[in-house]
Each structure stands twice: as C-alpha cells, then as structure tokens.
C-alpha cells in the first residue's frame, strides 16, 4: 500500500511536468469516471452531501494537490504537508461534530503541526512555499470532505468514488 501511494506522488509529479495541473486533474477524473460508471448510483436524500464530497475531496483536493506538485521542486515537502489532513479533520470534527479528543491526540496534533513548521523553515523547502501552501489547501479541502462523509449512510466506497 505504501508503495502504491508513493508511486502515485511520483507519477503525479511527472504528469504535472507534462500537462498543466488543471488539465491533468480533468484527465485523471475522466479516466476514473469511465472506469467507475457502473458504480454510479443515485442515493436519495444524500446526494447533496455526495456532491459536496466529490467537489471538495475530488476536484478541489486534486487541483490543489497537482498545483502543489507543479509549484514544488521536491515531492517530499508536498507529501509531508498533505499528512496534515488527519489533524485538520480531527480539529474540524471537534468543532463541528462535537467529538471529544483526549490529551494524547492533542499532543499528536501539536507534533504534526510542529513537524510541518520545522519542515517549512528548511532552506530547500523555504524556496518551495507556493507548493506548501497549495498542499495545505489540498489537505484542508479533503478534511472538510471527510466531515460530510461522516453523514453518509449505506453508500459503498465505489459508489462514492464514482461521484
């Protein structure tokens, strides 16, 4: 699984080197849409949440992700910053879903943000701040989409991916 995710970053970096980021995003979604058409189903009463999820977690997230790669010299800085999606989602779930987290999780969130702050001040990454900002936006948009995913009932993975 780790290999697949790592390979996805490398292939995406190569892709945005050949195509503009928004065109690459559109091409990616066209290919996936063709593969997932059989799973495209209407889920009555849940379509607004599904469309918000597909917009934020799909189009917006991947547009910012590809912009981050296009504006970064190093893939590693983008990959690390994208890991803030989990702390963002946790913070948002506390604010909007009234979830409760304990001190260990708070400490983990602080470590995650501290690590990214340290990364940003590394000289090679400091020159790639445009990519870091786009990666932050990509992570945040995915985190917001996760809040909407929590509201879904009986929607299968491929059904959601198809949208």
Predicted regions and their residues:
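Transmembrane alpha-helical segments that form core, pore/gating elements
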Residues: 32-36, 89-91, 127-163
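Juxtamembrane helix-loop-helix junctions in multi-pass membrane proteins
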Residues: 3-31, 144-163
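Specific alpha-helical transmembrane segments that line the substrate/conduction pathway
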Residues: 23-33, 69-100, 138
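Membrane-interface helix caps and helix-loop-helix hairpins in membrane proteins
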Residues: 16, 67-73, 121-130, 151
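Hydrophobic transmembrane alpha-helices of multi-pass small-molecule transport proteins
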Residues: 30, 36, 53, 91-92, ...
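Juxtamembrane helix-entry segments on the extracytoplasmic side of multipass membrane proteins
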Residues: 18-21, 26, 43-48, 121-141
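Specific transmembrane alpha-helical segments of multi-pass solute transporters/efflux pumps
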Residues: 3-9, 37-82, 87-90, 118
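Cytoplasmic-side transmembrane-helix entry/capping segments in multi-pass membrane proteins
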Residues: 47-56, 101-113, 131-135, 155-163
């Amino acid at each position: 699984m780790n290999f697949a995710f790592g390979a996805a970053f490398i292939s995406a970096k190569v892709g945005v080197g050949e195509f503009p980021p928004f065109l690459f995003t559109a091409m990616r979604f066209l290919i996936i849409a063709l593969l997932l058409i059989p799973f495209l189903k209407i889920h009555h009463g849940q379509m607004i949440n599904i469309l918000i999820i597909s917009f934020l977690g799909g189009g917006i997230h991947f547009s910012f992700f590809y912009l981050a790669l296009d504006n970064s010299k190093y893939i590693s800085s983008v990959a690390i910053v994208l890991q803030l999606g989990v702390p963002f989602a946790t913070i948002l779930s506390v604010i909007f879903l009234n979830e409760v987290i304990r001190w260990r999780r708070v400490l983990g969130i602080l470590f995650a943000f501290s690590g990214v702050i340290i990364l940003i001040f590394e000289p090679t990454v400091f020159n790639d701040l445009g990519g870091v900002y786009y990666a932050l936006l990509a992570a945040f948009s995915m985190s917001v989409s996760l809040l909407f995913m929590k509201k879904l009932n009986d929607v299968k993975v491929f059904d959601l991916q198809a949208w």
